Amino acid sequence: MTIQNNDRLVYEAMPTRPLVTWPEGRTVAVWHAPNVEHYDYIAPGGGTPQGRTRYPDPQHYMHRDNGNRTAFWRMLRAVDRFEIPSTVSLSLSVLEEMPEVRDAMAERGWEIMSHGISNLRPLYDMPYDDEDRFYELSQQLAETYYGGRRIKGMLGPKVSGTDNTSDLMVKHGMTYHADWIHDEQPRPLRTEGDGRLVSIPYSFMLNDVPLLLAKHYPGSYFVDMAKAQIDRMLRDADEDGQGRVACIATHPFVSGQPYMQRYLEEIFAYLRSDDRIWVATAADITDHYLENSYDEQLAHANGISAAREARA
């Protein structure tokens, strides 16, 4: 039986891979991804994204706008208290339109990861030249409004992309892509030429929107899931020696609500309670992987691919 497989990845079972390790003997890398999003008041191109059915739609728009007006600042206090380095999944229009949010992130040295211009402008079906200009604009916005820094990675707007996305990301200087949630380690993504791009595990499970907004679980459930997930990863890493990655994905308009502060702080306190946990940015995790594991893992993946092709 033949199915259409993704040509960016090679299937490799965890037990057969070369080891991935983290600095100072730590075994689980955890990155916090606050999604600081901006939405068009009237969605471009029509459609019914984010559950919105008619325009204008103050209910859904204002709920999300609350995140940047008030809830962001409450979340910031929790992050500051526990000194959690953060990788902001950012609607890049925030850099220009919300200078207070931008400056607060810059003062703390937060990494910004592209999450598009608006979270109502996905990349699906975008022509090559238009997507190329999208990355050019993304880097221009970061360089202009965020201290000359360039963006190293992306979580696509609405977690969207095209067949050209990986190659264009490399063309514009990016090294990691968070859309690929297929693993518990960074993995090499095949691209044109000799560009190096890796997937880094984001999370749709340890994520406040599906858990708290969509499913209406209590905040305590988010805490319990985060602890259980990372506890199990720590145990697995102790048993097989493989370093792992977990992501805590938050949104100010959800986790920045007053009732959530105690739960967010409980998660952050847990991350600081175990020396085996490396709390880092997505770029730090990617850079370490590229320097220490990428070449060996890519060679191993290519060997598996060649052997399978020879058997075919």
Task: Show the residue positions of the predicted features.
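A conserved mid-domain beta-alpha-beta active-site/ligand-binding segment of alpha/beta enzyme cores
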Residues: 201-234
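Catalytic alpha-helical scaffold of carbohydrate-active enzymes acting on polysaccharides/glycoconjugates
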Residues: 2-198, 223-248, 254-312
